[in-house]
Amino acid sequence: MMTVTRYHACRMIPALTLMLSLPGCAATRANTAEERPMHSINEFRDQRFADVADPWEGFNRSMYRFNFYFDKYVFLPVVTGYEFVTPGFVQQRISGFYNNLNEVRNLTNSMFQLKGVESATTLGRFLTNSTLGLGGMFDPATKFGLARHDQDFGKTLGYWGASSGPYLVLPIFGPSSLRDTGGLAVDYGISYGIYTAVDPFPNSSNGLAISAGISTLGTVDARHQQSFRYYESGYPFEYYMVRFLYHEKREIETGKAPVE
Amino acid sequence: MRLKLLLIACLILLPLPSLAADDGYGYPITGSYEATIMGTPAPLMPEFPARMNVRQLVLQVIPDRLKPPIFFYDEGLRCTFAYQKQKAPLVFLIAGAGASNQSTKLISMMKALYQAGFHVITLPSPTHANFIISASQSGIPGDLTEDAADLYRAMEVAWKQVQGDIEVSSFSLGGYSMGAAEAAFVAKLDEERRVFNFRKVLMVNPPVNVYSSAIRIEELLKQIPGGANKQGIFFNKMLSKFSEFYRYGNFVAINDDFLYAIYSERLFSHEQTAGLIGLTYRINLAGMIFASDVMTNSGYVVPKNRVLRSTDSLSDYFLVSTHLSFFDYFNEYFYPYFQKRRPDLTKEAFIESQSLRSIEGYLKSSVKFSAMANENDFIVSKGEIDYLRQLFGERAKIYPRGGHLGNLEYKENMAYMVDFFKE
């Protein structure tokens, strides 16, 4: 009887509080003693694959779960609403606009890495798309053969030899590493610095509101462009696969071969 | 962009002179393993609809199912539902082993059928964790008869959920790989239950016997130096190879160009490609074993009675589960479960029941079936391909190549599928 009430109570808790763990629900089975499983780790002498340094796994898994709920109750409803009210054509132009703004980040980091040709290409893209492409809404540069090179300060640090450090799942931003989190902060700092120097709304008393609106829309657009959904694969070891894919993709694109 | 076109052109043109003459089948990738990994190059796929009316279904198939905290994110069986505004036939599609309702191949089939005017509902494989957690009565997947019963129940619930919103003229059924074998058993069950009266049933690259196909896939892992127990070392080696190739190849990102280059430059040998397929299969199998063990509290890889919390590390279980073979699962977990319930069940009889042969009388007599297969599919033997020919006669469509499912999205194959459901 106790158990039944307990289960009912657990199921009635509003969904948001599920963000806290559910040890109460589990009480029914915990009374029985644990037994050794038929197969355990000691049997196998092999390297782990998909292995990434993750000393903060407990924290990371909590954040991973937080992001799942944040997506579900906040982020994705907003994105869905945006997609519903905005025509597809407009969505693409908005994405183009923000992608073009990010070329500034690509450019500064190509230069930090002293990559001459790449910097010139990115600068060419930015100038072409800002003018002919109407502020980035269209992408004629790609048609002219100027390929996009995504760069950020995390990659710059990696390029100059900094290792990724432990895996880190950030709230809202998602999978990252210690190095890339630092990089993210630097990139934001640089954009903020450029923004302050350029001061695009000098005579408007609503400058703050306008820039807040622009960055909010940017965040929504970024989630709109990102098709990843937490736990969507349904695969019980998804956390490890995502961790591995994130880490390897960064390692490879930074230009470092993985350690044997 | 130019590089990409060039690569695709090479891919399509190179093998053609030798092939076009003998069989007139345009799917370009000749190697069985290579086709399986590369699939169909995008320009050779049919045109898919730009927009679809589609929504996700989350179904409560087993009422009051208790889910362990580690599966807190699983809210019900997930199916994808694409619907027409007008009256149309409805096709249920079942995914292959370990695949979800949104696997790329399943979604391509859905798009092609939607384009041709069908309603479609896709279902995950009964071996996928979501199905095990939310729709499997026993929590122990892999038995064709029981999986078919679970699938049938799931289809009934899905139909109940959508029947108010659409008009349906008839029901059909399709599946690929293990989903194809399951489709046959679901169709047989439907002859008794008569809820759907399936008009047509399509099996794409079915195993003839699930057990022997699993053996053939396990064989792939034997091509790894040191065998399956050294798969971690093998994988890490392949990964370095992959990274170095990227590093020295002047690629812009990990994208289609890069992947085609891996194929055209033959980065991985035939044996290594085989090993990678085998490893992918093991990774899938690991998800099934773990999910099943947790749901049934069997103490197979997780200590019996341990309640995993949502933030507990699963790292060790991941390693253990990926190192278990199909034989381990079969002999230590799967067969004992059935033997306990039916003590007179011999292993041979049980293996034989996981086969199309066990229902061949039905399959032969019913005109509603068609099977698509590839001569060089490594999950079936030459003899099994002949068996499919003999079983289905003109209703067997055998292609000269395509590996396992590699040509499923090729436009000629998709056209055959659509025509079959239309006629």
Feature map (PLM): residue ranges:
Chain A
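Bacterial N-terminal signal peptides that target proteins for export
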Residues: 2-13
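Hydrophobic helical h-region of N-terminal Sec-dependent signal peptides
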Residues: 14-18
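A structured, mid-to-C-terminal "fold-capping" secondary-structure block
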Residues: 36-50, 160-260
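Post-signal-peptide N-terminal segment of Sec-exported extracytoplasmic proteins
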Residues: 44-76
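Membrane interface segments of multi-pass transport proteins and intramembrane proteases
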Residues: 73, 78-89
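Mid-length scaffold segments of soluble, non-membrane domains
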Residues: 96-178
